[in-house]
Amino acid sequence: AAAVSSVTEVAGRYSVHDVNGRKARLMLAKNPAGWQEAMTMVDPRVDQVVIGVNGQVPDGQDLSWLWDVDFSGVNRPGRRVIACGERGADLAVRLEYAGIHCDLAPLPMDALAACEPGRVEVLLNYTAMRDFKVLLDRKEGKR
């Protein structure tokens, strides 16, 4: 248990990136069970959450599983939630049905730019994370 608590990053997951004053912590969720687990990891003290979903072949193009995820873990007074990604509109509908008002942005980088400076929790599915990491690495001079 002590070893697990000391893990800070695994293949980009849980990594923190400073993007123009926004400290974005990245979390990857690839299936309903992963999304449920990610919901428990959202820091309750953070006022901004970006959730991104793409629908490419590696993600699975059928996003009906969104309705199996309990998104209530991100819902709290004063928190801003931004849905994004290729299937951001589908995600926004799902969040609204869960009672979570959200804004909509085309891409995770756009969603992050729409946030106020400070901490931001960023939950993304596989290709949304992959594409976002490419942009982050470029911005940080890693690629």
Report each predicted region and the residues it spans.
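ATP-dependent carboxylate-amine ligase
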Residues: 2-143
